[in-house]
Every structure is written in C-alpha cells, then in structure tokens.
Regions:
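Surface segments flanking catalytic/ligand-binding clefts of nucleic-acid enzymes
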Residues: 168-303
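Short gly/ser-rich loop at a beta-strand->alpha-helix junction or flexible surface loop bordering the NTP-binding
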Residues: 1-187
Length: 303
C-alpha cells in the first residue's frame, strides 16, 4: 500500500554459525553481522525467505563439494543467495530432487565439467582472482560487483537498479565501486548496467521503495529525495521522521507501506502517529492500496 501526502511549505532550515560470520566478513568486511545485514528493513516472512534461500544454496554447495562436483565460482542467482540479498528475478529453478540449481562461472569453455546434475556453468573470459571471494569452507563466490554485472543478461534495467540498491543497503558494495567495476571490465550486458547505474541511489529501505521511485520516474516524475527527513517533528525516542521519497521544492512526500505496516502492531501504531503529526502540519494525506496499478491505468508513461 502506498501513502501519498503533500506537506505544507517548511522552513529552509539464522545462519548464526561461525562459518556464516566468516563468510560475510570475507564478502564485504561486515564485522557486526547481526546488526548490519540489512534484514531489519524487511517484513519477517521476507527476511525468513532470504535466509532460507541462503541456507539452501550453502547446503547444496557443501554437498557438491563433498562429492568433488563443485567447480568454478558461484555466480548469478547462486551468488546473490549466498550474499543474503533479495533476488529481484525471484529465480526458483530447482533440480528433480527439489534443490536449487547452482550457477557457476569459469574463464573458458574448456573449464566446464559436463554431466553434473544441478550445476549450470557460464563463461566469462574476464574472470580473475580480484573478482572472487573465498570462504572458509573453500566455496568461491563472485564479489558483489561482478555478481551484479552477471545478472545483466537476464534482468531488466529496473531490476538491475533494484539489485544494486539492495546490495548497497546490505553493505555489500557502493555505487562508486560498481562504477569502478564497469569502467575496468568487459562483459555481456555492460551497456545495460551503465544505464541502470545512472538510476541507482542510496538510502532505499526495500526493493519495493526502489520500484516505487522507478515507477514515478517512468512517468516523468523525477527529483525525489530518498529517505527525506521532515524537519520540526520527531518520534518520542528522538528518532527523525522520514519519508521514503520527497520533493523538497514542491513539498511532496510519498511512502510505500508493505504488508507488515498492517500486520505488525507496533509498526501500525508508529504509522498512525506519524500520519497524525503530518496532518497537524496541515498536511493533506490520501491512501490507496493499488496506487501504482492505478497510475499505470490512467497516466501515460513518458517516452
């Protein structure tokens, strides 16, 4: 559900094992795994789904390695799952045994090994040691930047933006690191990644918020600040009141409310208090559960 509010002018003023912790430190230097993994931004069921997918892929890779059938470097959806980041493609490919398909990348076609069920090999001639993260268990995973790039063949530009912002939200990479990678590497879909990077912004709290911003942009509505802090009001604990998206010049604020805003009692109460504070400020508030869908029906997209 989305909330659209126009404000009056303002003054200008689970895995918990040591292996998982070591893996996350190796991947992106996160020391406080439990406090910095980005899962606090998702509703419980979504966070649980991400963690389960991560655990599943890890278990499959361990089993393949024990049978000496794991080779190359984890890439694409497998690398996304291992990093604990939401996968915008919602890939659910599984083997006949019901386990996730594992994607690996090798440098040349000669490095492919045939006849291993459940393993899909891709070739990237530019693969080098600097692109690989080594885990304590000996499972090699593409670093976040080439992982993002590897999805260019299957994701749309908007989905690449969602993936990049999710990686940034989880502390896996930065926009600057993605730009450096694009500048120094060649791969299929590079142009698509360059277009996506132009749209990437930091501060998004969820993939749905990214989707909302991109939806507005597709109608020519640009210039929205992400995570805008509303001046003059704050929560009882002193925390700032923010809006998912805002245009400070036009005094327009927009928020995306996921289902947990309805089902989580504490979140619901915070939302009610927040809306009342905005109304006290002479704000005008309207709510619609299908706001994006309605825009798609009644407003032509900009070319």
């Amino acid at each position: 559900m989305c909330i659209f509010c126009v404000l009056r002018p303002q003054p200008r003023c689970s895995w918990t094992s040591n292996r998982r912790k070591q893996y996350l430190r190796t991947m992106n230097g996160i020391n406080d795994v439990n406090g910095s993994n980005g899962q606090q931004h998702y509703k419980p069921l979504e966070a649980q789904s991400i963690a389960q997918r991560q655990q599943e892929v890890w278990n499959v890779c361990r089993a393949l390695k024990d049978r000496n059938e794991l080779y190359g470097v984890l890439t694409r959806n497998s690398a996304i799952a291992m990093s604990g980041v939401p996968d915008p493609s919602m890939d659910s490919a599984r083997t006949a045994d019901g386990v996730p398909v594992v994607h690996v990348v090798v440098q040349t076609a000669r490095n492919r090994r045939k006849g291993i069920p459940g393993v899909v090999a891709h070739v990237w001639k530019g693969l080098s040691e600097e692109h690989i993260c080594h885990t304590q268990d000996g499972i090699d995973v593409l670093a976040p930047e080439p992982t993002w790039a590897s999805m260019a063949e299957t994701l749309s530009v908007d989905m690449l933006v969602e993936l990049a912002e999710s990686q940034m939200r989880h502390g896996r990479t930065t926009k600057e690191k993605l730009a450096v990678f694009l500048e120094g590497n060649s791969f299929r879909g590079r142009r698509k990644c360059q277009l996506a990077l132009l749209l990437v912004e930091s501060g998004s709290d969820s993939p749905k918020e990214t989707e909302l911003r991109l939806c507005l942009l597709s109608y020519g509505l640009s210039g929205f600040a992400v995570g805008y802090v509303v001046s003059g009001i704050s929560f009882e604990n002193g925390a700032a009141v923010t809006l998912d998206l805002a245009d400070p010049e036009l005094k327009i604020g927009i928020e995306y409310d996921g289902d947990h805003h309805r089902t989580d009692k504490m979140q619901w109460r915070r939302d009610v208090w927040k809306r009342r504070q905005l109304e006290v400020w002479d704000g005008r508030l309207s709510r619609s559960p299908n706001w994006i869908c309605r825009m798609n029906r009644i407003v032509p997209r900009s070319p």
